Amino acid sequence: YLYLMDINILQISNSDCSVMQQSVNIGHEEVHMSYIEFQNVKKIYKMGDVKIKALNGADFSIEKGEFAVIAGASGAGKSTILNLMGGMDTATTGKIIVDKENVSKFSAKKLTTYRRYDIGFVFQFYNLVQNLTVRENVELATQICKNPLDIDEVIEAVGLKDRSSNFPSQLSGGEQQRVAIARALAKNPKLLLCDEPTGALDYNTGKQILKLLQDTCRKRGVTVVVITHNLALTAMGDKVIKVKNGIVDSVTVNENPLPVEQIEW
C-alpha cells in the first residue's frame, strides 16, 4: 500500500541549474561529499528460513545535477537501489546519504516527509487518476508539497498544453507518461528516480520520453536517476552504474554523454 500511495505523489526538482559539489570540513581538511552516496549498503529479505541478498554491499556516488544510469539484468538489484534511494524501503545495513542526510537512519515519519518533498518517481506504468483531466492529475500532486511549480508551465514544458483538458483514456501511452513526468516536475523535489520509464512504450515514443528526462536534467539542473536493462542507454548517462548479482560491478564517468537522439538499439 505504501508503494501505491507514493506512486500517486510523484515529483521532480527545479533545483539550482549548476552542478554543485558539496563538502564537509574535518579538522583543517575539506573532504568532498557527493550528493548521493551508497556506503556498503546491504538489503536482505527473509522468506521463512531463507535469506535473499537483493543488495550485498553496494558502493557508489552520484553528484548533484548528474544524469545517472543504473543498468543491469532483471533481478540484479536495480529496483532495490531505487527503492532505497527514494525511501520506499530501508537498508538492512550500510549508509545511504542524500544531500548530507543519512536516509538510512530516518524514522518512518521522516521517510514519509522525504518521499513527499524530496523525491520524484516515474515508473513503467503511469498510475494516473482516470476520472481526472491532465491538469487535475498534475494539480493533485501539488497539493501536498511545499513549493510547487506553476502547473500550466509544467504541462507546457512536457508538450501537453493542448491536451490539458483531456482524460487519461484519451491519451496515448507516451502522452500518459508525460503526464506522470509533469506530475513529478510540478512537485519540485530534489531527485527524479525513474524505474524503466520506457518499458511499456514503443521505440519512438520511448526516445521522446528519454529526451524529456535528459532535457529536464540539462535545462533544470535536476538530478535524474534512470534504471534500465537496456545497455544502449548507458551512452546518455553522465555516470553509469552497472549492477550484477546484488553488487555494483562497475562505475563509469562518461565525459561525453550522447543525446538520446544519437542512440540506437
Give the label of every model feature segment:
Residues 30-32:
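Short, intrinsically disordered, charge-balanced linker/junction segments flanking boundaries
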Residues 35-242:
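ABC family nucleotide-binding domain
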Residues 247-265:
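Conserved beta-strand-loop-alpha-helix hinge in the C-terminal portion
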Residues 2-4:
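Short hydrophobic targeting helices and cationic amphipathic motifs
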Residues 22-23:
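Cationic, low-complexity basic patches in intrinsically disordered or flexible, solvent-exposed regions
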